[in-house]
Amino acid sequence: MNKKRNAVEWAMHYRQIIILVVCCLVAFGIYSLPNMRKNEFPDFTIRQGIVVAVAPGNTAEEMVEQVAKPLENYIFSYKEVKKDKTFSMSRDGIVYIQVQLNDELNNKDEFWSKFKHGVSTFKAQLPKNVLAVQVMDDFGDTSALLITMESVDKTYRELDDYMDALQDRLRRINSIGRMTVSGMQKEQISIYLDTHKLSQYGLTEQTLAVTLFTKGFTTSGGRVKNPVYVQPVYVAKSLNTVRDVQEQIVYTDPIGNNIRLKDVARVVKEYPAPDSYITNNGKKCLLLSIEMKKGKNIVQMGEEINRTIAEFQPSLPSDVNLFCITDQSQVVGDSVDNFLHELLVAIIAVIIVVMLLLPMRVALVAASTIPITIFISLGLFHAFDIELNTVTLAALIVTLGMIVDNSIVIIDSYLEKLGEGVSRWHASIQSATHFFKSIFSATCAISITFFPFLITTTGQIQDFLVSFPWAISIVLGVSLLVAALLVPFMQFYFIRKPMESATNKNGKKKFSFLDALQKYYNKLLDLCFTWPRMTMALGLLSIIIGIVLMGKLPQRLMPIAERNQFAVEISLPTGTAVEKTGQIADSLEHILRNDPRVVSVASFVGCASPRFQTAYAPQIAGTNFAQFIVNTVSNQATEDLLNEYAPKYTDYFPEALVRFKQLSYNEATYPVEVRLSGENIDTLRREAEKVTALLRSMPELVLVSTNFNDPLATTRVVLKEDEATRLGISNVMLETTLAMRYGSGIPVATVWEGDYDISVKLKNSQADSANSCDLEDELIPVAGGLANVPLRQVADVVPAWENGQIVRRNGIYTITVMADLQRGENGMDVTGKVQKAVANLSFSPDVTLTYGCLLYTSPS
């Protein structure tokens, strides 16, 4: 009766099947490498959203009391909301609430759908002047590419037409998800009213607004219906051009004399002064943000987009250029190329190292298992829909050294048995069979080591690591099977002789590094067994020294992103006009662009860029904020520029804080954040001043500030009730009049030119260049516009200071004292110093101290 063969013996007998299967799997792995899913990071569930509520005319305090608090109470009624990380920022007329969801919530789309429906219903309970409440649940979506379309001479409208044509072409690429365009400035028809002429004819702004609104409003004209046919009725629009607006009759006297709009106002078609704009290398531009569909190959998508852009560029005028600011597909492609380079280096290193100890044939057999295992693993990744990203690439790199160990152990045993006189066939089978249990146990032990990560981590870190244990297990499992089933035949076929000690002409053994190593290793073993207590003591001492050294090493959970780009954030006092912000941004941009190491500078003035890197969240901007995305010639150039420019230009501009930010994978906004919470804002301010002074005295810190921002200079108009009532002036009439004359304009109609809408706005010529004296002397119409009185006659006009921003975290007022680090400082080390220093301060008993820096945003 034939003896039953084990797996190794079966593989030797049916080697043709094993070789065929291995070749097919390797070929599939080679095919999978360019075609499998690739991305920079694993798919994160960004459990964040933004709720924005707008209520013009409210101060920051009024926004807190009337809007933020009711919204917070409603938001906290959802059990899915993580309250301690949900916070609101109330500003002049607007409130932003960043909602953080619980880490265990995976189906965020279901929650946001339910939440949006609830918020739309809840809006009715807010004050009537709350114009809109919007929920943005795409806050965490990351742009795969940011592409600018720039020109010096073309108008925004022309650029928009070219951008539409580009989007039409890009939509043909199946892997592209959402595309959004930023930076568009639309034309408007501005009606600059002459208040003196209005008074002369007894007209008011409100009268004109109502007249123009009725001319521009479109509704159904009904239908002509009979038993045979139904004809819709369309009333032609009266406002179709600038001339139509100019020629509108706004007043007719009893004898038929007409007053047209052009008689009392200057009507022009123009680009209004923007509150925000985007430029690239000093040229006006539109920014196209491209996102990838989930589960697609970002490298292939990038190649298709670049091909499409190359084909589209010749169709554009010569002064219109396309430029790619950020390209995640290039980052991922470079990561794959770097891995292949590391793979080649590993194979060569194994061959060289093994050659020092063993013959060439042995080295080649051992080294050949590396590419075989890697490509089979890549094929399995593709088959199991595991994408190639930073985490899975890390798993492949970590296991490079482990892959070859299994093969070397079996080959070494094979050589030993050959030296004992065992036949090649039986030596090959016995070597693999003898060590299979040991190798299998080691593989299981190493694989199981990483699975507790899936239990101990939550939220974003778990999303980041979820594929790591599986990738490790697949690679090591493939390595085990290759060593047990393929290596036995490879060593049988290629290694035909045992290792023999070489001799010289005198018959003496030649020097062998392996023999020398074995000789001294045996001596060391003898010493260890002779002095067992000393051996144990040295082992214990080495563990203690290792623990001490580990505690002294600088720690950082999430690393710096090695990129050829960095960000710059410019912040000015609250209320700063976008023109002044633009001047400082333009000056710094010129400084950067004059450096040959800088390739491009994309400038966002009054706004923030889309999320172009997973951990770099978009900023909540205003007219006092600007941001750069700076591209450099290399990763090293980025380091050099930051080391040179950050210390020099952080405080270079008066009133401006300039933050040079190197991209990293940590989600903390600032590396050092000290939070003071309580119910009294004045108390919090006093305590925050202590912390601010302390942090500014520490040389490791720069850009120390608070999130309450600087006070906002305002003008408060208080009606003299008796005089105003006698003259028929109400709050609504006064607010409407001042809004028309000192605001960005009141929209009264829309003119359509095809698919291009042009807003018609009533405004005052001094709206963008006025001061407090002009406001006091402003003539307010009374008696239906037949007379005017200066504002100071019916109201007190007084300057006032208001809070620039009020922040509440978990429904409690919270001032955060923030600070950035000097270049080269370690965030966790500095945080420890800050904690020790702050511990020596005395705070009011009703103030709670917490931290929100790198140490506390990094999961343990």
Task: Say what each PLM segment does.
Residues 1-38, 435, 447, 489, ...:
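Signature of alpha-helical transmembrane segments and their immediate interfacial
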Residues 2-13, 21-38, 113-149, 186-275, ...:
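Helix/segment boundary signal
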Residues 5-8, 12, 62-138, 196-217, ...:
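Solvent-exposed, membrane-proximal periplasmic/extracellular interface segments of envelope transport
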Residues 16-17, 23-58, 62, 106, ...:
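Transmembrane helices with small-residue packing motifs
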Residues 29-32, 348, 352-356, 360-415, ...:
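Hydrophobic transmembrane alpha-helices and their membrane-interface caps
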Residues 325, 336, 411, 417-441:
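Helix-loop junctions and hydrophobic alpha-helical segments within the transmembrane domains
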Residues 400-414, 436-456, 463-506, 628:
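Transmembrane alpha-helices and their membrane-interface boundaries in multi-pass membrane transporters
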Residues 856-860:
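Conserved small/polar residues in nucleotide/adenosyl-binding loops
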